[in-house]
Amino acid sequence: MSDKLNALLERLKAHQRTLILAMAEHDGLPAGSALRQVAELENVIAAVEPVAAEETERAGRVG
């Protein structure tokens, strides 16, 4: 399960990075919806990281 969680983290971070880089291409402030997407991704990343770490630790104890 830790492999799947780590893969999810990588996908989330990659998507967030893509959004940020796209926002940087435009002059002025990004749209509020784009900012919300980045913030929501940050919240999900912050929630998944400890679960992934816990699963990795658990797998290390079992295996």
Residue ranges with predicted function:
Residues 20-25, 29-63:
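Short, charge-rich amphipathic interface segments used for partner binding and complex assembly
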Residues 1-13:
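Short, charge/polar-rich alpha-helical segments
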Residues 15-18:
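A short, structured beta-strand/loop element
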